[in-house]
């Protein structure tokens, strides 16, 4: 009788231990763990066009965003001059400049990189004897946005096309570029390096180095109005500089500007100049100091 009671007690203890062990070791495919993984993944899913959400650790997420879930933007601008790296492309006349871009979502929450394609255009004027009427640029590249969009990068390609230009002038060319930037809050800085294996007008190898600092003005009197100032400086090197129409193989350009954004419309006034005098700029004033006003809107 005593042995029977001891056996029953041992059996009950074994059943209790087994039940405790089962509750403590939930299977990896159980609903509880699956719900936790879904919630964790949702918390770390980035908004399209933004960097990944800040979390303590990333889940083993391998899903890539759909290729057609991106964003389309269109910008329309009008300016009193089209200045390309300090040199007027319209002989100081008005320019109209539309731009269209499609950007994909970021690849994943752990790889905040997106791809983009687009086109940008402007009227140009190179003189009465030159039939070129417009520049149309085709662009493509990869963009990085990390650290809550504070760190940005752009690895891009531009194909410059000049409508109406005779083929034997070799105006069309390719350019590759890398742009890096960081937003410190009180100021944003950007730097770029651009390379062309054969620049405008068959001018050979060309390099352009550029830097810019933008400072938002903290004063606000309306939530729909914002101000900022910026300064930029660049250096252009051209191998066969005479083909490009300048007097030496490199020059500097710089500008200082002020932008007011009013209900989504950007109004910019900029002072632009180069170190190229008239004799070194094809005996024109296209490289001289000037003020350029631009109005633009992005949709």
Language-model features: where?
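Short loop/turn motifs that connect adjacent beta-strands in outer-membrane beta-barrel proteins
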Residues: 59-71, 105-115, 130, 145-152, ...
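Detector for outer-membrane/organellar transmembrane beta-barrel domains
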Residues: 171-245, 271
């Amino acid at each position: 009788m005593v042995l029977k009671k001891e056996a029953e007690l041992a059996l009950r203890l074994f059943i209790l231990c087994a039940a405790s062990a089962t509750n403590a070791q939930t299977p990896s495919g159980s609903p509880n763990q699956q719900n936790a993984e879904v919630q964790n993944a949702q918390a770390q899913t980035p908004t399209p066009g933004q960097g990944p959400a800040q979390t303590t650790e990333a889940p083993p997420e391998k899903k890539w965003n759909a290729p057609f879930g991106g964003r389309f933007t269109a910008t329309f601008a009008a300016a009193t001059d089209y200045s390309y790296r300090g040199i007027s492309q319209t002989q100081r006349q008005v320019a109209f400049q539309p731009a269209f871009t499609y950007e994909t979502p970021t690849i994943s929450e752990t790889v905040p990189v997106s791809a983009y394609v687009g086109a940008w255009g402007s009227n140009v004027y190179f003189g009465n004897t030159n039939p070129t009427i417009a520049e149309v640029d085709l662009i493509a590249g990869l963009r990085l946005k990390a650290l809550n969009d504070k760190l940005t990068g752009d690895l891009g390609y531009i194909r410059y096309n000049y409508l109406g230009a005779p083929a034997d002038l070799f105006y069309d060319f390719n350019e590759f570029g890398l742009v890096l930037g960081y937003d410190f809050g009180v100021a944003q800085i950007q730097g770029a390096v651009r390379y062309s294996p054969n620049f405008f007008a068959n001018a050979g190898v060309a390099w352009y180095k550029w830097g810019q600092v933008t400072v938002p003005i903290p004063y606000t009197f309306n939530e729909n109005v914002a101000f900022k100032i910026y300064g930029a400086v660049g250096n252009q090197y051209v191998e066969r500089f005479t083909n490009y129409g300048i007097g030496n193989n490199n020059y500097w350009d710089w500008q200082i500007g002020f932008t007011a954004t009013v209900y989504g419309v950007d109004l910019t006034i900029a002072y632009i100049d180069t170190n190229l005098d008239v004799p070194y700029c094809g005996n024109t004033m296209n490289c001289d100091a000037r003020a350029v006003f631009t109005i633009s809107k992005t949709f």
